[in-house]
């Protein structure tokens, strides 16, 4: 008779029960656990406020009008260990963490707002201190217009920028502006926080390099500030800066224009498919005369967001017919006027940096399209222009569009300089370089138009 089974026996219970030892599934067949969703929505998480955790929309997002989205948590937890002692099918834990994808932008349906040809935005966040300027810069009117890109150099005498890559249209900053360059570090949160007086590094989501995520966070913080401080009052933006004159002494682009509801031209043409319906409060803020010019309602950052959507589409477009190019130039100026007229979108340093990026990138578009257009108006060996009808008139219209953007940019720099009292030299250097470059570009256009008129 066998002795009874002792509780201190070394025999496993499953073996004692007669079932035999349990076999683990072979390595590589174990299923990974589904990612755990974050308890708070993206907007509340980035703003560091308590979320009501409502589905499909929390109370705060419902009140502010922001998109409510729940993303996977960045804390993956401890994975289940396999039989061989390694985790996650034998791969080191740090190797798996490197492949994790973090939360997507709050604003759905928009790509990285500054994405473009050669993915220059991704290339610009590195330590090479590259920015997004790509401007027509020949200083000598006698330079051969068709011998290369329009932007060989920009204001080298003032040391603002040192060079440009001809394929991607990316221009690096010079070393003397390295300490004040807002695009100088790998992490955009540190560079933006260093440039803004009184701001903290927690303002920008440190793990995300998405401009869309940064805009979402700035908008969320702005909503919280408005809720605590109440409606703000102040003079309209059109009275903040005086009249602006371009390098050729022409009349400035007026700040005052039709309200947003009447700007139907922005929803047509090559950029129409990128528009989104405006927020009702945003449209009322721009169009209701009963509110008054000094009373500011929250526009939920729609002015800058929608304008940057159009800009993103323009950067992603490889080529346009010349007539569509003219329409795009007009839409650029119209979209910029919307941002400039909105005190909410231009009411803080972070928004002014976004507006500065908008204008710089629009100038990049202008320069690249202009160079491509000039390549099409070169005469063949018989002196005939086979691809473009009436090239002198189209060159004239291009010159007008460049001057308009230059004037709007000068207006931005005036207000930008008022904001950045600690670094006034940066805005002044930008103004000098941009004015000098665009002045030379328009002069070359006029000379080219004269040459075309003489050959026809």
From Swiss-Prot:
DNA-binding span(s): 41-68
Region Disordered, annotated ranges: 1-34, 181-206
| Superkingdom of this protein's organism | Eukaryota
Q: What Gene Ontology cellular-component terms does the record carry?
A: nucleus
Annotated knockout phenotype: Does not affect the production of scytalone.
Respond yes or no to whether keyword Zinc is given for this record: yes
- Gene this chain is encoded by: PfmaF
Lineage, uppermost ranks = Eukaryota, Fungi, Dikarya, Ascomycota, Pezizomycotina
This protein is called Transcription factor PfmaF
Q: What does this protein do?
A: Transcription factor that positively regulates the expression of the gene cluster that mediates the biosynthesis of dihydroxynaphthalene (DHN)-melanin, a bluish-green pigment forming a dark layer in the conidial wall that protects the conidia from UV radiations. PfmaF assists PfmaH in promoting melanin synthesis. PfmaF may function as a broad regulator promoting also other secondary metabolism as well as fungal development.
Can you cite a GO biological process for this protein? melanin biosynthetic process
Q: One Pfam family this chain carries?
A: Zn_clus
Please name the InterPro entries in this protein's record.
Answer: OAF3, Zn2-C6_fun-type_DNA-bd_sf, Zn2Cys6_DnaBD
Q: Name one GO molecular function term.
A: zinc ion binding
Annotated keywords: DNA-binding, Melanin biosynthesis, Metal-binding, Nucleus, Transcription, Transcription regulation, Zinc
Q: Is Metal-binding given among the entry's keywords?
A: yes
This protein's major location comes to nucleus
């Amino acid at each position: 008779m066998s002795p009874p089974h002792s509780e201190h026996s070394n025999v496993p219970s499953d073996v004692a029960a007669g079932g035999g030892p349990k076999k683990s599934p072979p390595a590589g067949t174990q299923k990974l656990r589904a990612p755990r969703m974050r308890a708070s929505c993206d907007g509340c998480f980035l703003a560091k406020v308590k979320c009501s955790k409502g589905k499909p929309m929390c109370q705060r997002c419902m009140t502010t009008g922001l998109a409510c989205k729940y993303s996977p948590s960045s804390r993956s937890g401890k994975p289940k260990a396999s039989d061989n002692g390694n985790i996650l099918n034998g791969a080191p834990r740090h190797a798996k963490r490197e492949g994790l994808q973090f939360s997507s932008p709050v604003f759905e349906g928009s790509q990285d707002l500054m994405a473009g040809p050669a993915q220059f935005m991704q290339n610009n966040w590195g330590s090479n201190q590259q920015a997004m300027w790509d401007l027509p810069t020949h200083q000598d009117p006698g330079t051969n217009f068709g011998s290369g890109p329009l932007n060989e150099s920009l204001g080298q005498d003032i040391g603002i920028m040192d060079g440009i890559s001809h394929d991607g249209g990316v221009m690096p900053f010079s070393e003397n502006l390295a300490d004040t360059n807002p695009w100088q570090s790998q992490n955009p949160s540190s560079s933006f926080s260093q440039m803004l007086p009184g701001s903290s590094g927690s303002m920008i989501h440190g793990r995300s390099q998405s401009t869309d995520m940064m805009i979402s966070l700035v908008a969320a913080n702005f909503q919280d500030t408005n809720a605590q401080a109440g409606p703000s009052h102040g003079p309209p933006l059109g009275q903040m800066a005086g009249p602006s004159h371009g390098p050729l002494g022409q009349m400035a682009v007026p700040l005052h224009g039709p309200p947003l509801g009447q700007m139907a031209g922005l929803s047509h043409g090559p950029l129409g498919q990128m528009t989104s319906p405006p927020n009702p409060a945003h449209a009322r803020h721009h169009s209701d005369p009963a509110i008054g010019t000094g009373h500011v309602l929250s526009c939920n950052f729609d002015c800058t967001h929608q304008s940057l959507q159009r800009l993103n589409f323009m950067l992603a477009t490889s080529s346009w017919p010349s007539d569509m190019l003219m329409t795009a130039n007009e839409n650029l100026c119209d979209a910029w006027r919307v941002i400039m007229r909105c005190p909410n979108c231009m009411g803080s340093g972070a928004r002014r940096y976004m507006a500065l990026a908008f204008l710089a990138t629009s100038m990049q578009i202008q320069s690249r399209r202009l160079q491509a257009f000039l390549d099409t108006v070169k005469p063949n060996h018989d002196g005939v222009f086979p691809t473009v009808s009436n090239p002198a008139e189209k060159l004239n219209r291009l010159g007008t569009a460049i001057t308009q953007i230059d004037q709007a940019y000068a207006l931005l720099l005036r207000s930008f300089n008022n904001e950045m009292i600690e670094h006034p030299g940066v805005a002044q250097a930008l103004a000098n370089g941009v004015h000098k470059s665009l002045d030379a570009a328009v002069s070359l256009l006029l000379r080219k138009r004269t040459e075309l008129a003489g050959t026809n």
